[in-house]
Amino acid sequence: MNTVEENNTKITDNNNNNNNNNNNNNNNNNNNKNNDGENLSQQLIDSNNKKLRSPIQVYFDSDVSSCSLQSQSSPQQLPTQQPIQQQINNIFNHFLPQNQAPLLQAQNQQPINNINQVSNFQIQPIPLTFQLPNNINTNTNNTNMINNVQQFQNNFLNNNDFSLTDPVPSPFVLFNNNNNNNNNNNNNNNNNINNFHHNNINNNFDNNNSNYNTINTHPNNTNNNSSNINQIQSNIYPQQNLHNPFLPIHNNNNINNNNINKNNNNYNNNNNNKNNNNNNNNNNNNNNPQLFSMEPPNGFNHSTTDNTSSVSSVPSNKKKSSKTKQKSKPLTIQQQQQHKSNYHQQPNQNSQHLQSKPNSPILISSPLNSQQNSSPPQPSPTQSFLSPPQYSQSPQNNNFNNNNNNISNNNNNNNNNNNNNNNNNNNNNNNNNNNNNNNNNNNNNNNNNNNNNINNSTNNNNNNSNTNNNTNTNTNNNNNKNNNNNNNNEIENNNNEELILLWYNSIIKNIIVDENHFKIENQFNKENGYLVFKQLFKNHFGSIGTIGKEMAEYIQLHCEVMNEITELSKFHFQSIDNFYNNYIRIINGYSLIPAKDSGATIKARPKKGAKLSKESKDILENWIKNHIAHPYPTNDEKEQLQRQTGLTPNQISNWFINTRRRKVPTLCDEAGIITNSNVMPQMTINNNNNNGGNSNFKNNNNNTITTTSTSNNNNNNNNNNHNEMECDDGENEESSEYDD
């Protein structure tokens, strides 16, 4: 059975003025002080400790404007590094067509001789027009937040750890057109989330600007204005409320705290007559969690002609027990509203004449309760119309609710709230100058009278009797609130850390779009890079737990759009690779000449048979007859023969290798050139074998050859054959392909 002392403690719980209100979110930043690796991250970001860093060097090994490929060779062959901004502009200039697929159809079947002809096959560019979701407000209210996120990302990319000349642009810059009208309202330019120097910071939401503004208050001022959460959600997201896994979940504790704040403010303003129902509802919710208060619709006139209240619950089987002869009924909510001036009931008063107001709050059963009643319950046949209504609990257990209403409306003295130590089964006597019932007031029996002696000084002893219990309950409630706030802060910090990791990975993926076209100098340690990013985040935004819900949602949307741009850029590079590797090679009648370096142009030649034409053979034979003394063409001579014959350098080299082996000795005999054991004439060749033999050939003006040999003829023949193999320029795989 609930006693009056418990009721008084609940009332004094609500009467404490802002001293027991949501006792401080003091642990917003304390949870982040002991994070592992913070000292390491501070060292990594320190400019004096550059040796600990793992620098990222981004190379762009292909010129997107010319669409030339880069071989995966040494970094010395890489072209001059372009700014990232220029590279991205080049990427966007060669982006996707309207149908989201590359148009790789050739305009003609002519030979591809340079990159200008390859550009005829390029895909058509389209502008980047990303549209923000409908639930995101892109007015001037979010301009400061957009600039703040962009500034932090630019600072991170311009750090010494990255060798980037220009940062990766934010996709939201495209949507800031005509959004710079109200930047000076309430000095929001200086109130961005930039300065977080105290452990205790108020996250006050400005409804006029719909933006979080940090207020650098004193560390002792820890009142958290959390009463506008629902209003914030309705203002920012009028269409739908997104469920974000990276955002903190606001549980029912905030809603309960808001109710407590409202009650405290009403007590301070002495609006006791307007808050009777609120106090009643709070007490009823504490006793019966299945009941909650709601306002009936307009025009709903709820009468009590059947002498039953609108409290819907299961009728109790317990019977009313009374030890006194004078029978009294507990006052209903509607009766108390009509009798605001006098809060006690006459013994023979008939409740049949009472009617509730149309807009009076009623207590209905919870939707979770299967026994919900949409209409007031009808009295049982055995129940008298003059009998009090039946509650889910016995009348003795619920009579204290009426006392709470009486106590909350006595503004004369706060200490009188602790004097109601009896049930409403007895008479309520308001004796202003009664000194005879002091002994009865000192007892806590349920059968004594309630004597509200407002001007009686002897009642102060009784008033002080329950103060210790009240303070104990208040401290316990404060401890519970602190524990709930700490748990909420830990959840928010964990979600925000996941959001920071998502942002970091999005930036890295946006920089290194495709590993085939972008290279990293040395080996980048992503763990150390994340510590640097996290420390920069703390320096710029403050504690991880204080970024706010709207900022967290914006960062997540920022990462989503950045990832979309990364995927589109990756598709662009894949389209280029597929274009070169598949499309050009299947052109009928032409074959692609692969590029050996980044500066070489892409060429294609007509496909020909294995045997050379007669005209090409005559040109090559005439050249070797004229140079029979030294049949080794230089690179310039090979290019000249290439232009005359229309052959490739590989074909010319293979022809000279085969001719020197098979026809040069015969041509030398026909020309009257004397050779030693069919040794091929050369200008000067020094051969060293294992025996230490030296063979020196010198070409004189009279085409005579002077030979000095220290080895036998077999060694000379072996050395000469070895020399022939070294002169084929590494292209002897087709040596027998062009035999006559």
Swiss-Prot record:
Residues 1-41, 179-491, 686-740 are annotated as: Disordered. Residues 14-34, 179-241, 251-288, 303-316, 365-390, 397-491, 686-722 have a biased composition (Low complexity). Pfam families: Homeodomain. Residues 605-667 bind DNA. The keyword Transcription applies. One of its GO terms (molecular function) is RNA polymerase II cis-regulatory region sequence-specific DNA binding. Keywords: Coiled coil, Developmental protein, DNA-binding, Homeobox, Nucleus, Transcription, Transcription regulation. InterPro entries: HD, Homeodomain-like_sf. Residues 726-740 have a biased composition (Acidic residues). Residues 254-287, 472-500 form a coiled coil. Residues 1-13, 339-363 have a biased composition (Polar residues). Residues 317-328 have a biased composition (Basic residues). Disulfide bonds: none annotated. It is found in: Nucleus. GO terms for biological process: mitotic cytokinesis; negative regulation of gene expression; negative regulation of sorocarp spore cell differentiation; regulation of transcription by RNA polymerase II; slug development involved in sorocarp development. GO terms for cellular component: nucleus; transcription regulator complex. Putative transcription factor. This is Homeobox protein 4. It comes from Dictyostelium discoideum. The gene is hbx4.
